[in-house]
Amino acid sequence: MIKFLSALILLLVTTAAQAERIRDLTSVQGVRQNSLIGYGLVVGLDGTGDQTTQTPFTTQTLNNMLSQLGITVPTGTNMQLKNVAAVMVTASLPPFGRQGQTIDVVVSSMGNAKSLRGGTLLMTPLKGVDSQVYALAQGNILVGGAGASAGGSSVQVNQLNGGRITNGAVIERELPSQFGVGNTLNLQLNDEDFSMAQQIADTINRVRGYGSATALDARTIQVRVPSGNSSQVRFLADIQNMQVNVTPQDAKVVINSRTGSVVMNREVTLDSCAVAQGNLSVTVNRQANVSQPDTPFGGGQTVVTPQTQIDLRQSGGSLQSVRSSASLNNVVRALNALGATPMDLMSILQSMQSAGCLRAKLEII
């Protein structure tokens, strides 16, 4: 009766507040994907394959494949092939994958092929880090890009040297699983957070009894489970559907230095400050002045004299006030009022954080 009342109170509290399921915040330790890789050949290309004179490994791979099929290529034969390409094939072996199950594969050219459109991947073994074959891949490649070339001009949309084969590999070997062994399981938070880890442990203890879950650190919650696969599956199904109140996220600003993009979450706040940003531009203009003699047969020489002009300009630099902002919309308005470009905004945010005006973590990727 006490457990029922506790569960009812927890349900009413989580319904009134913003809550998320435990399954959306955590994953089960040990239940993960495993990467597979393989090397193979793509055939059937419309003259867009590897130039075999520049990619000898393509010819060598083709000779090995033909010899396995009982076809012997005379030594010294120079095969000029345009419809074959050497590729790398990658896939992910899902957790609890069983023999006969199909998985998607990604095919990427490793030579100088122009396009893989219309090609067919020949049977390719996919291996794990232990060099064991776990799947076999084969099938027609779907390329999302398009392109055409003629007379030295070319037009291309998206990428042509990579494609995907849906359900293109069949699992041939299963990975041993430790699921169901032991009386404890670890739930791992997607993002480390001490308060969230403790809150999840408290939620499980209120419903399943105190001592059922323990927060080990900011990312790991250890849960006591019954023995046996079926019992643990039912226990996890109940736990993962429990809801917990989501704690506020850490204020963070992420800057991509390569693209100039700036992303911030709603917890970012600003304190009042003054910002001055000046743009410094340098323009170098170089011209060649040609000096020729006035008389054609006077014995003079033509002289080329380079003339270089450097122009230095500095604009902006006026001091502007930034008001204190507590919401994301106000932060955006305050930063837009500066009239800075994304590249300028990156340096402004760094300076604001150093001055203590930006209440957020600054992450540059």
UniProtKB/Swiss-Prot annotation:
Quick one: signal sequence residues?
1-19
Q: Does the keyword Signal apply?
A: yes
Q: Which GO terms describe its cellular component?
A: bacterial-type flagellum basal body, distal rod, P ring; outer membrane-bounded periplasmic space
Q: Which molecular function terms from Gene Ontology are attached? A: structural molecule activity
What domain of life? Bacteria
Ordered alphabetically, the record's keywords are:
Bacterial flagellum, Periplasm, Signal
Q: Which residues form a coiled coil?
A: none
Its predominant location is periplasm
Tell me the InterPro entries matching this sequence.
Flag_FlgI
List localization entries: Periplasm; Bacterial flagellum basal body
- A GO BP annotation: bacterial-type flagellum-dependent cell motility
Name the PANTHER family on file: FLAGELLAR P-RING PERIPLASMIC PROTEIN FLGI, FLAGELLAR P-RING PROTEIN
Quaternary assembly: The basal body constitutes a major portion of the flagellar organelle and consists of four rings (L,P,S, and M) mounted on a central rod.
Q: Give the UniProt family note.
A: Belongs to the FlgI family.
Q: What's this chain's function?
A: Assembles around the rod to form the L-ring and probably protects the motor/basal body from shearing forces during rotation.
Its name, as the record gives it, is Flagellar P-ring protein
